[in-house]
């Protein structure tokens, strides 16, 4: 997921010792709290990449 890759890097920079499972939990919570209008660009980019890789 495009958004999670970007956000994961941010979390890892702030908390380099945080376990991957905890990072994933935080990312899931953050994603659920994002309003749809903020999610749409990332969803569209993920779809574009999916189609590109299928070609």
Curated annotation (Swiss-Prot):
Primary location group: nucleus
Subcellular location: Nucleus
GO molecular function, one term: DNA binding
Record-annotated disulphide pairs: none
Domain of life (superkingdom): Eukaryota
Secretion signal span: none
UniProt keywords, alphabetically: DNA-binding, Nucleus
InterPro entries the UniProt entry points to: HMG_box_dom (IPR009071), HMG_box_dom_sf (IPR036910), SRY-related_HMG-box_TF-like (IPR050140)
One Pfam match: HMG_box
Cellular component GO terms, alphabetical: nucleus
DNA-binding region: 1-55
Name of the protein: Protein SOX-19
Organism annotation: Mus musculus
